[in-house]
């Protein structure tokens, strides 16, 4: 394949590379010549440069992986995530955000000038503006342990742990953009609409089909993992060299329809 994306020989770190969007992106990155260091609790099938078994809700596990990663990194992809239910509210927040944030907070000093960070949020997190004070309050807890303690003591966590975790990713992405720009490092996230993954299969096993169908785009289908993986790979590439600080809905126009009043705003998108 052409090297227009600029991945040949690049050192790329990715969480959540075993399944779904992360697996699709990992396959593409290997094809594009990147050296991929994959972190996941499950086996990774893509022929990555190195696989590090990692539990993203366990600080010791994450720190052990960090110690094995290269001293210079070109791109970091945060793709690990679980649905709630069936995962507990606590585990959902720990994996989807607390562990997710711990990794880039440790690795950002290693990201080269011109490098990039990209994470998977969700259209379920698009109500972040209406919950900004609470999100910022959580982000102000700068350590892994402080976040863990807050989550254990929060009686409201179970109501929407998944949505809150994705709101945190979106706000975290935007808050870091200015500081990282001084080093010419970019940071972005994507908000997928429902996607045909193992993740979605688990979610649909816990929720009635009627609860998920209203969030399907007007093209009438869920996205494929590869359709999301391609966007991630693009955002980390040289072709996206001036894109930073944005959350990009990858939803075939779902959020646009909500904004134009053409669909009910079921997720309080703002």
Where are these regions (language model features)?
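Catalytic loop of short-chain dehydrogenase/reductase
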Residues: 81-86, 116-182, 194-195
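Alpha-helical segment proximal to the catalytic Tyr-Lys
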Residues: 109, 178-179, 241
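Conserved glycine-rich cofactor-binding loop
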Residues: 11, 18-19
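Rossmann-fold cofactor-recognition segment
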Residues: 46-60
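Short C-terminal tail/terminal secondary-structure segment
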Residues: 2-4, 244-270
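Short, small/polar-rich loop/turn modules that mediate ligand/substrate recognition or access, typified
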Residues: 181, 186, 243-245
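C-terminal helical subdomain
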Residues: 102, 162, 167-170, 189, ...
């Amino acid at each position: 394949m052409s090297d227009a994306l600029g991945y040949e020989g690049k050192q790329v770190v990715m969480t959540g590379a075993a399944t779904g969007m992360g697996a699709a992106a990992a396959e593409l990155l290997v094809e594009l010549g990147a050296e991929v260091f994959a972190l996941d609790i499950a086996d990774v099938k893509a022929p990555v440069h190195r696989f590090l078994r990692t539990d993203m809700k366990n600080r010791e596990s994450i720190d052990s992986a960090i110690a094995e990663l290269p001293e210079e990194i070109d791109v970091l992809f945060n793709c690990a995530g679980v649905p709630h239910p069936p995962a507990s509210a606590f585990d959902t927040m720990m994996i989807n955000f607390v562990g997710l944030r711990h990794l880039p907070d440790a690795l950002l000093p290693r990201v080269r000038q011109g490098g990039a960070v990209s994470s998977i949020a969700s259209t379920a997190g698009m109500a972040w503006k209406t919950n900004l004070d609470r999100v910022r309050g959580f982000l102000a807890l700068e350590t892994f342990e402080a976040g863990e303690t807050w989550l254990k003591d929060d009686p409201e966590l179970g109501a929407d742990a998944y949505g809150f975790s994705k709101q945190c990713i979106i706000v975290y992405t935007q808050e870091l953009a200015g500081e990282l720009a001084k080093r010419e490092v970019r940071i972005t996230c994507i908000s997928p609409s429902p996607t045909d993954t193992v993740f979605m299969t688990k979610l649909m096993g816990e929720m009635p089909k009627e609860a998920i169908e209203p969030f399907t785009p007007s093209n009438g289908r869920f996205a494929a993992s590869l359709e999301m993986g391609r966007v991630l790979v693009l955002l980390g590439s040289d072709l996206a060299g001036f894109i930073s600080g944005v959350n990009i809905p990858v939803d075939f126009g779902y959020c646009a329809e909500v904004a134009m009043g053409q669909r009910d705003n079921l997720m309080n998108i703002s």
